Amino acid sequence: MQVELIIKNLKVYNSYFKKFIKSDVLINEGKFLHIGKGYEDRLWSENIIDGEDKYIIPGLIDIHMHIESSMTIPREFSKAAIKHGVTTVVADPHEIANVFGVRGIEEFIKFKGNLDIFYGIPSSVPSTSSSLETTGEKITHNEVKRLLEYDNIICLGEVMNFKDLIEDDDSNINKIINISKEKNIPLEGHCPKIQGVDLSLYIYRGVNGDHTQQSVGSLQEKIQNGMFIEMQHKSMTLENIKFLIENNLYEHFALVTDDVMADKLVKGHLDEILKEAVKLGMSIENAIYASTYTPARRMNLLDRGTIAPGKLADFILLDSIEDFNIYEVYKNGEMVFNRDKGLKEEFFEDKSKLDYRFYNSIELNNITKESLEVKVPNKYKNKVNCRTMKVLKNTTFTEEGEVTLNVYNNILQWEKSSCALIAVFERYGKNNNISFGLVEGEIIKEGAIATTWAHDHHNLMVMGRNISDMTIAANEVINSRGGYVVSKNNEVIAKLELPIGGIISDEPIEIIGEKLGEVRNAMRDLGYNHMNEIMSFSTLSLPVSPALKITDKGLIDVKKGSIVSLFKKGLY
């Protein structure tokens, strides 16, 4: 029998024994046909390659990520990710869904990047409820029924609305979960700091996976209660990895990325998480297992994730296993990336364009300096105690703090304080909401930052040390049809335009990455000190991430799931 390709003299990663075995690999019709020797009298090919003792492993599989986190479209994401050995992803498009609803999800599905992109149905759009945040659209159980008809929808995306899930049997999220259970698909979770009976109730409803930031304690409790853990960068600590290794928990977790910014994507993707696991003490064999085999099984992608007869021929050739040096990447048995020659461009032939309406979604007039004045109720005279959001350095969580500020003519006098002002403007033309908060911590010491890439509602959020710079940054975002802007001394010093829904761009990823890098550096120059400045700022608006966050409706006490006042009490 003639086969399409034979690669000889390889060190083949065997997922079942978690070790490398010297062998030949035979490929036919996009699948592995035979791994081994002794085939010459029965199988042959006109296309024989000497593997030169290289390592071959399955293509990497990222089962929890958001394409919108890279601020790009699926095609451009595919071109970037495949260079890093990623051949399959499961994307939760809840960012585009918050802006455009089902229409946005279907537009993403329409794009073909030739990387295998499967999708999870956004389960929490909005992430909380319409009483706590304004979004462009909603996803209800009716839309879920429609989306489940798509072949590449394979799971329910992260369930964030914990309060409605456990307190209201008839809530939208419970209806969504019940419909999804009928399809027997994995139900992905989002449950930071949920424990004890609350965690049991969460799992009891059917949600049995979590990707949020973990500790040794949360890993133990969640895994012993049957949860599958998806380890992202924030969870990659020495203590966590040691716990997973010592307890031999390789069947119960996978490595994932969750959010990879565009300036980071040009340098790495899931391969970087894999290498981080190895640096922290995990063997390369087990790190590969957690990036290929376990994620495939978690998502019922049983046709891939291992090098064995009948499985998809998605694989990576490595020069060196020690530094994970990628030489070539193959998709369905076809070489799509070579380190020296680059991408095989014809493999990425899709040229789909988005409808023009996706480029004009900001329904907001330019703001004025007066609109940024924080008016204080008459009952507070000269001084007032205010809540603050304290930014923490190594997490996207915040802590609630308190500061005393002067009041003059019913206007809060914050500019000479230790805090920055943060404001959220509703941008969908629905209610013209404006809310205010105060932020402290290792944040900007001057200037301002503004963005519509504000998770998950993506309203216009601006934070600054003076009203003038805040106005300039916010209006530049509006005039750019969305994006990220940093201003200082009444000038824009860094800008990334995100005209598609205010959250993504169709420019090449290299250009997006360069501009985002300039924004990041500008934030650092202004004093923002965090392991990920972009995500830190952009999640100040995420009302499912502890502890105090802000939306267009006001300050949100995340644990209580309720709006709280900026003002605590007056001091006369």
Curated annotation (Swiss-Prot):
Belongs to the metallo-dependent hydrolases superfamily. Adenine deaminase family. It comes from the Bacteria. GO terms for biological process: adenine catabolic process. Its cofactor is Mn(2+). It catalyses: adenine + H2O + H(+) = hypoxanthine + NH4(+). The keyword Hydrolase applies. This is Adenine deaminase. Pfam families: Adenine_deam_C (PF13382), Amidohydro_1 (PF01979). It comes from Clostridium perfringens (strain 13 / Type A).
